[in-house]
Amino acid sequence: MTNTTAAIVFHNYPQSPVAEKVRVAFGIKTLSWQDVEIPRLPPKPMLTALTGGYRRTPVMQIGADIYCDSQCIIHELERRYPTPSYMPTSDAGLMWCLSRYTDGEMFTLTVKLILGSAGDTLPEDFAQDRGRLYLGEDWADGLKRANEQLPHLVSQLRAPLSWINAQLSDGRAFLLGSAPAAIDAQIYYAVWFIRGRWSGGPSMLSEFPDLMRWEENVRALGHGTSKPMSADAAIALAKSSIPTSAIGVAENEPQGLETGMLVSISPDLDGGEQPVSGNVRYADANTISIERSSDEVGQICVHFPRAGYRVTVA
């Protein structure tokens, strides 16, 4: 049985938009969490010791269970803390489908707009790291194209922002009604990023009064209650714990995975990232969990979403 009272440890940094998504998710459920601040740029040795090489932000840790990707994190928070629900209506499946757009195309447009508008003012190391992560191997050309296509990128973002504004035009407090939902956090983080990191953001967002009203409602949810924690303490917590998550492989597994099988996992795009290897502990349509061990962190279990990640049998 999962221990829902175990401490939530959140590895993040303040400027991360994807971490902001999860911080808002903490606020929706008024959760308490331990805040481990990680570097904005690699190397991130204390983080990758826990994840087996995954370097993206954020990562959630509960004992020796390590959750990578905000999709996986929000699923697990809902499972452990079902009230209040991230899915207050009967549209949970539809909202998860919509989140694939907000986390995919919509966020990619936002990144291109922000990186492209910054142009040569970006620090070289930051431009190279984020460019490679989001724009592929030819990231320098990608940044140049983004800069040249700024009006087009703005037009592509204004469309979904106008849809969101229309959804809120009946005066509802949140996207699905009177109660906040995961999809509020999954859209808000892009708006937060646009407002905070693009000089034209406040002006563009001002075109959408209902969206701005909603933005204030989401901001007022807060981030739950956090206390700082050192990376060393997080490592020690993992080493003194054992994984408590489920074991097994669901029926109709399309890749023929079995418990104990050695696999590697990586984002299903070319971001130049190191795959994470381990032995299958659990797999179903939504999640894959692998076991790893090292002298530094002991026995751990690293969890990833199935959607958006490639699993390769070793």
Residue ranges and their predicted role:
Residues 180-182, 257-260:
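Short gly/pro-enriched beta-turn/loop segments at secondary-structure junctions
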Residues 224-259:
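Mixed-charge, Lys/Arg-rich low-complexity intrinsically disordered regions
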Residues 102-220:
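GST-like fold's C-terminal all-alpha helical module
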Residues 268-272:
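Short, charged beta-turn/beta-strand-edge "cap" motif at the junction between a beta-strand
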Residues 6, 10-18, 219-229, 236:
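N-terminal short leaders/motifs
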Residues 86-89, 175-177, 227:
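Short, hydrophobic secondary-structure boundary micro-motifs
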Residues 1-134, 141, 257, 264, ...:
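GST-like domain detector, emphasizing the conserved glutathione-binding G-site
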